[in-house]
Amino acid sequence: VLALLPSPEVAPHSSLSRMAGFAVERWGRPRSRFLADPDAGVDGPSVREALDEAREEAAPVLLLGTAFAWVHWLEWAEAQQYRARLPEGSRLMETGGFKGRSREIPRDELYRRLQETLGLPRHRMVNEYGMTELLSQMYEPVLVAPEAGDEGQRDDRAPTPAQGAALSGSRAHRAPPWLGIRVLDPETLEPLPPGQVGLLSFMDLANVASVSAVLTEDLGRLDSEGGLHLQGRAPGAEPRGCSLALEEMLEAQS
């Protein structure tokens, strides 16, 4: 597990660092590490070293980071003309959103650059949507998409055209069964039917020691199958998210 994040010890109040720490404890190998800190930002050379070690050992890698952490590292890697070919079975999770205070990063551009630099197919890249107020998270089910076949897309082979279409549709985020999602009218807070965009509200039964119902200023819509399609922040809402925290940390170094 390689995380382009500060460690939980360095950032004890970051829910994302804490989550990554749990992943390292559960699935990490001895060389798992955190590759960012508030003083130095993302450690580009150390990321490269860790990726090269994984390739030499043919050890699959789980990469974790925010969108802006990946952009920061990609700028370093592209300046160095660095290219990697990650071992089969590797995965990448990005989170935190693509809009920052200083610029907007189109998602297709980020994924294209990650694919070119890491040699990782796009259907091995997963977006996570969550927040510190919720214990549960929502993920895109692209790693195993039932629509792609009985076995799903469980390996690194390129999907067929039919599977590719199914995987494209599976970019909608899916919630665990104990996390309820409602889309509300911004003016009346009345529930909206599938297909209409409104404010996102959650009821997380995993929040046993805190408030279970959370109303956000995020916009989205539900499809007919319960998939969540994110539409950004409500007009006038304060920008927030893990990517912004990393962006602020990186800007402080410049």
What are these regions (language model features)?
Residues 7, 13, 21-254:
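Active-site glycine/GP-rich loop and adjacent strand/helix microenvironment
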Residues 1-6:
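Short hydrophobic beta-strand segments
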